[in-house]
């Protein structure tokens, strides 16, 4: 699963997800892409599940690019712990995804195959997504 090798700080504020993605919202590498329509945190496990779904469907053909990286640590407190005594320990990593963000790109396969592979990947994600092609209009 994806996670940073090292970070400057162990813990981060939760932050807010306002507005559209103004970076990472154009197709850069492939011909087909999966674009987020809603804002959400996407965990490293969800990214890996989506990647597996796509690679298993396209088998040996084509290439996949993952355009999001989980670089935000999410902390959790142990179960049945009283409040106070500081922030919990980092449990997992998430990528902050805003509407318009390209999450996955694909190349080297026919459009129907790419569309089905992206549909399978989208089922693993907790947000609404949109299949787009290189010459298509974005959100």
Swiss-Prot record:
Part of the 50S ribosomal subunit. It comes from Picosynechococcus sp. (strain ATCC 27264 / PCC 7002 / PR-6) (Agmenellum quadruplicatum). It comes from the Bacteria. One of its GO terms (biological process) is translation. Keywords: Ribonucleoprotein, Ribosomal protein, RNA-binding, rRNA-binding, tRNA-binding. GO terms for cellular component: cytosolic large ribosomal subunit. InterPro entries: Ribosomal_uL16, Ribosomal_uL16_bact-type, Ribosomal_uL16_CS, Ribosomal_uL16_dom, Ribosomal_uL16_sf. The keyword Transport does not apply. This is Large ribosomal subunit protein uL16. Belongs to the universal ribosomal protein uL16 family. GO terms for molecular function: rRNA binding; structural constituent of ribosome; tRNA binding. NCBIfam families: rplP_bact (TIGR01164). Binds 23S rRNA and is also seen to make contacts with the A and possibly P site tRNAs. PANTHER family: 50S/60S RIBOSOMAL PROTEIN L16 (PTHR12220), LARGE RIBOSOMAL SUBUNIT PROTEIN UL16M (PTHR12220:SF13). The keyword Metal-binding does not apply.
